[in-house]
A protein has these predicted regions:
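Membrane-interface coil-to-helix junctions
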Residues: 18-114, 138, 143-157, 261-284, ...
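Transmembrane-helix motifs of polytopic, lipid-linked glycan transferases
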Residues: 105-125, 371-375
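Transmembrane-helix signature of polytopic, membrane-embedded enzymes
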Residues: 118-141, 385-395
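Extracytoplasmic
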Residues: 216, 396-540
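Membrane-interface transmembrane helices that cradle and orient dolichyl/undecaprenyl
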Residues: 163-179
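Start-transfer (signal-anchor) and selected internal transmembrane alpha helices
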Residues: 1-24, 225-233, 307, 311-326
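Perimembrane helix-loop-helix junctions
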Residues: 169-171, 200-233, 306-315
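Periplasmic/ER-lumenal interhelical loops and adjacent helix-loop junctions
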Residues: 36-55, 231, 239-308, 332, ...
Length: 540
């Protein structure tokens, strides 16, 4: 027991140190640095994590009622909920009061958790700690996750190895307790990232059938009882997520097969990487749709692991069958509906209508190859005359492949008017310009700035946009006007923030004329060359 605790502490500390090395200097500047500050998806992620981190303690029963698209409710469900990321970040948010610090902590923690989970999975399958370390680094720090640093949910990869580890433990000794552990791991992945929860569901479902066949477990009542317990626990724990998914689908949100064709992988994606040891290949690719290169170790040793594992004993062959098949199937699915498999899955699995990017199956390709690579490394070390040296060299190469140049910048400071707004009585806020649907992503900055006051916003940006918001956007965009104020009266919108920079000279002159015309209905709270802040004191 004590040895296991010591090993766990060393593993966590090791991956924390590697995370600090690869993502330096972010760990020492949680509140003042952020990756690619101007990226709108990144701004959305900062807001999302901070909202959950705050709401989980301040108003836990209203965590889904995010402060966007007022007066709609359950607006957090319009995109990834990020409940797991926000929950683990909540202590940091309350200690610092910084949305950036909360987000950055969750970002860093995702690498540590993923590395730890993959280490224990690879150790269980390869029976070699050194091989497990290399496999874990290859997966947790793969190029794909660095390409998606602005998307906090896509960094939450730990549920893949932890869920498969829980399954293997169940398969080795089926008990209700191990079934419950599997269900818990799968549910936690659902709270961390809906995309990956679908992957985990498919992977575990396939693993259950493969092991039932290869081991003859289909005749074992204990096996099916444990699997049933896992399914039941996973479903029960995921009920809130299921309800929100049904709510969103009933609201009209769904992804079409035609739309998914924009987000498919191609062969170039599996050679694309921005990591230092790989970036030279980009010049030969011309263009690429995704970043899915598994790394040199993953590709070479993954193939070796499949070959040597197939010739080994029954237990190792089981691993090759499971992870080799998962890798090939995920590769096939990542090419999208025109390749066939993705279209079949879309038609038979209801949750696929919530997915958009087939290319994200590429993460499962990296996952499977990393597992197989750890098998190859264990095989190599077992036959090596100098296993310590070989394992050290492999770890150095794995760390080298994890190194990537990252563009961290200073966090964006909110305009001082938002500080003033935070001191004012509560009330809905309209941010202008409203922006069209095409430019709706720019509203993510409004959401980020709202972390200084947390008042409800009429505006918003998310995967799903309420139809009535689009319908009223044109009227609101003319604020102040009779049509805008009449619309705002319905929801008792109290404040309006006007960002002047996007307005051209003629538009700004027209705006100022309307401000004078509707002055009896407005109280000007702040004015400078960048921003106007009004309180609506009455309506026409």
């Amino acid at each position: 027991m004590r040895k296991g605790v010591r090993e766990f502490a060393l593993v966590v500390a090791g991956f924390a140190a590697l995370t600090a090395l690869v993502l330096r200097p972010l760990p020492w500047h949680l509140s003042t640095l952020v990756y690619n500050p101007e990226n709108n998806d990144g701004q959305f992620s900062v807001w999302n994590v901070a909202w959950v981190a705050r709401a989980i303690w301040h108003q836990p029963f209203h965590v889904l009622d995010a402060n966007i698209f007022y007066p709609h409710r359950w607006t957090l469900a319009y995109s990834e909920l990020n409940l797991f990321a926000g929950t683990i970040a909540s202590p940091v948010y309350w200690l610092t009061g910084s949305a950036y610090a909360a987000h950055n902590f969750a970002l860093l923690a995702s690498f540590v958790m993923s590395g730890t989970g993959m280490y224990y999975l690879c150790r269980a399958l390869s029976s070699d700690r050194r091989a497990a370390a290399v496999g874990a680094i290859a997966f947790a720090f793969c190029p794909h996750v660095f390409a998606h640093l602005p998307h906090i949910q896509l960094l939450m990869t730990a549920g893949l190895p932890f869920s498969l580890l829980a399954f293997h433990r169940l398969a080795d000794r089926p008990t209700a307790g191990r079934g419950a552990t599997l269900g818990l791991a799968m549910a936690l992945q659902a709270y961390a990232c809906a995309y990956y929860s679908v992957f985990v569901l498919l992977m575990i479902g396939f693993a259950v059938l493969v092991f039932a066949w290869l081991r003859g477990s289909w005749k074992s009542p204990a096996y099916w009882k444990a699997v049933g317990v896992g399914a039941l626990v996973s479903i029960l724990l995921s009920v809130p997520l299921i309800i929100t998914a049904v709510f969103l689908q009933q609201s009209g949100f769904n992804r079409t097969l035609a739309g998914s064709r924009q987000y498919v992988a191609d062969w170039r994606a599996y050679l694309a990487s921005g990591n230092l040891l790989h970036a030279w290949m980009l010049a030969y690719l011309g263009h690429w749709k995704e970043v899915l290169f598994p790394g040199f170790l993953g590709v070479v040793l993954g193939v070796v692991g499949a070959a040597v594992g197939w010739r080994a004993g029954r237990r190792t062959r089981e691993i090759v069958v499971l992870y080799g098949t998962l890798t090939v199937a995920a590769l096939w699915a990542s090419f999208g509906p025109d390749a066939g498999l993705y279209a079949v899955l879309y038609r038979i699995i209801p949750t696929f209508s919530m997915l958009r990017a087939p290319s994200r199956f590429g993460l499962v390709v990296v996952f499977g190859l990393s597992v197989l690579a750890s098998m190859a490394i264990a095989w190599i070390l077992e036959r090596s005359r100098r296993p310590a040296l070989v394992s050290a060299l492999l770890i150095v190469v794995a760390v080298g492949e994890a190194m990537v140049p990252l563009a961290f910048g200073r966090t964006l400071a909110s305009h001082p008017a938002y500080g003033l707004l935070a001191t004012l009585p509560d009330g809905p806020v309209l941010e202008l310009p409203v922006y069209s649907r095409v430019l709706g992503f720019r509203r993510a900055r409004y959401m980020l700035d709202s972390t200084t006051h947390w008042k409800p916003l009429v505006d918003g940006y998310s995967d799903y946009i309420p139809p009535d918001f689009d319908a009223r956007a044109e009227a609101l965009a003319d604020f102040p006007s009779v049509s805008a104020l009449t619309d705002m009266k319905r929801d008792r919108v109290r404040y309006a923030v006007v960002h002047l920079e996007p307005y051209e000279a003629a538009m700004r002159a027209d705006l100022e004329q309307r401000v004078r015309q509707f002055a009896p209905y407005l109280r000007e709270l702040h004015r400078d060359n960048e921003l106007l802040l009004f309180e609506i004191v009455s309506y026409p």
